[in-house]
């Protein structure tokens, strides 16, 4: 599902620095596709056409970035037959925060974990493993639910909340919800945890304990705070219209415990979890070690004209202005270099350059 997949790319990239209390203000997108000019009739069975994937993914990424107010100042798509089997969707971001707003402390027994942001649904169940497993002709019909459904406005509210130093200084430790859902986002915060899955806000009824625990629904954060700071933190969340609920406590016993409908459905020792499961060792054979990079070209006097025409007719050398213009590159008033420059505003910029974001006054940094 290209739209949701690309939106998840940028949404997840924003939440990673956000868990460190950083405000993301700068983004770039580099993607890879097959031949987008190929006839749709030549599309491989069970695959979406390359032009559909390319366009839909671009709109998914730009839609999320534009709504959340993130300047994307470098956008480039590369074309190569290898991207037909596995598309590339790369989102890179830069974030910053005042040093005094960042507190990193070890959780202690009695501390509580607050889940804030979006609600939990079945979207994204199995997403982390789904992106790596073998795809078949049925995948396009059966695997769509593995892609999370993003909500940029919800994440924008969390960004606003985390720019408030009075709020972030209450946080001892933070994690964003990504692969593995509650199991990972909350499970990584402390050695001993007791999680009540019935307290996790749901998008709709009918989810079982396993689905609640592993759902990768977006726009969710988990934070560790002291018991005496819960009311103040939740009150600040309410000011930004963000749902915030206490769902877990830190325990002395180093076990990850989950309760659902009055039953204990998970009880694992931390020392077992820290082994990271079974280690797999496989033998690999590199079959194309001598492959040449697409841009490694040679020419001669005799073939110069033909080689020049080959370069100019390559999709990788076509103007990407149409793609770049759907991304907001100036929101936030920190942009130094726009994606296109030069006398005719057609020359691609080779770097993403922006000033640091400040809430008051003007900066030249």
Task: Go through each PLM region and give its residues.
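Glycine/proline-enriched, intrinsically flexible loops and inter-domain linkers
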Residues: 1-365
